[in-house]
Amino acid sequence: RDKIRSKSKQIAGMQLGMALEGRLGIIIDSTARDVEKISSQAANLRSIGYDIHMVFVNTTLEVALERNRSRPRVLPDAVVINSHKQIQKNMGRLQRIFGHRNFLIVDNNKYGEDVNPMVHKKIRGMISRAPTSYQAVRWIHRELEKRKRK
């Protein structure tokens, strides 16, 4: 199992490297518990010209506990409570890292409600904006110049 996991991580790392080299859009899925790691990833992406956004899917502690209990692989309540507290505590810092304009909070407390269409619409709006960073604009210009020469 560890061998498979190690190989999977290696392949994922290579794919990420290629995506970053081509300046493709990427999605990082996280629990938002490790704000230092997220901050580091955000800074690295910004440094190469990425505009970054965060979708923060929020639930109450009660809903988190209830959903945990209905999963096939249940975590102890103490782990869920601790994680939820940490994530809620990190919300303000994450908003500062990503900026108000690029931080979307989704309320995911209602059972049976499909939040995906609403989230998809908001994300499309965020990513359809033209890049604003100097690095991104410069990279796009260089790539367009390369195409003209071919």
Regions found by a protein language model. Name each.
Residues 61-150:
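Conserved GTP-binding G-domain of TRAFAC-class P-loop NTPases and closely related GTPase folds
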Residues 2, 54, 70:
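Short, flexible active-site loop motifs that bind/organize anionic cofactors or intermediates
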Residues 20, 27-28, 54-59, 65, ...:
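Generic hydrophobic secondary-structure signal
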Residues 33, 46-67:
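Conserved phosphate-donor/acceptor-positioning beta-strand/loop module used by diverse small-molecule
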Residues 26, 52, 101-103:
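Hydrophobic anchor at the start of a short beta-strand
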Residues 1-46:
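Conserved nucleotide-sensing/catalytic segment adjacent to the nucleotide-binding pocket
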